């Protein structure tokens, strides 16, 4: 049982390492054009987030875990709103205060 658990964590470590290294090599060797590169990085990021939620936070879609999953999703949405709002404010400040 204990050995099986360690093998699972080792597999997840290798999987997440590959998902981290793939975008770096895609940038260095210019495998994709710029738009496809952004999409590739976002897809790798999405799969990393799902793997962390599933395997390290041990969350799933069962009824017992539903409220924990909802709280994680809510936290991600609030963080995304704060991030995008900050980018929007800084971009508008740059456009409005730019000296021509």
From Swiss-Prot:
Database matches in InterPro entries: Cyt_c_oxidase_su4_prok (IPR005171), Cytochrome_c_oxidase_bac_sub4 (IPR050968)
Pfam families named in the record: COX4_pro
GO biological process, one term: electron transport coupled proton transport
Gene Ontology molecular functions: cytochrome bo3 ubiquinol oxidase activity; proton transmembrane transporter activity
Keywords: Cell membrane, Electron transport, Membrane, Oxidoreductase, Transmembrane, Transmembrane helix, Transport
Residues in the Cytoplasmic compartment per record: 1-9, 60-68
Localization per record: Cell membrane
Membrane keyword on record: yes
Transmembrane segments: 10-32, 37-59, 69-90
Domain of life of the source: Bacteria
Extracellular side: 33-36, 91-100
GO annotations of cellular component type: cytochrome o ubiquinol oxidase complex; plasma membrane
Subcellular location, principal: membrane
Entry keyword annotation includes Endoplasmic reticulum: no
Membrane topology of the entry: Multi-pass membrane protein
Protein purpose: Cytochrome bo(3) ubiquinol terminal oxidase is the component of the aerobic respiratory chain of E.coli that predominates when cells are grown at high aeration. Has proton pump activity across the membrane in addition to electron transfer, pumping 2 protons/electron.
Complex formation: Heterooctamer of two A chains, two B chains, two C chains and two D chains.
Family (UniProt): Belongs to the cytochrome c oxidase bacterial subunit 4 family.
Name of the protein described by the UniProt record: Cytochrome bo(3) ubiquinol oxidase subunit 4
Gene of this entry: cyoD
């Amino acid at each position: 049982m204990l050995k099986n658990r360690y093998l699972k964590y080792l597999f997840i470590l290798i999987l997440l390492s590959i998902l981290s290294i793939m975008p770096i090599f895609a940038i260095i060797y210019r495998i994709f054009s710029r738009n496809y590169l952004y999409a590739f990085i976002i897809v790798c990021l999405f799969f990393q987030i799902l793997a962390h939620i599933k395997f390290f936070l041990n969350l799933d879609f069962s009824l017992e875990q539903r409220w924990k999953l909802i709280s994680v999703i809510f936290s991600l949405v609030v963080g995304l709103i704060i991030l995008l709002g900050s980018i929007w404010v800084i971009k508008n400040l740059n456009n409005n205060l730019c000296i021509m």
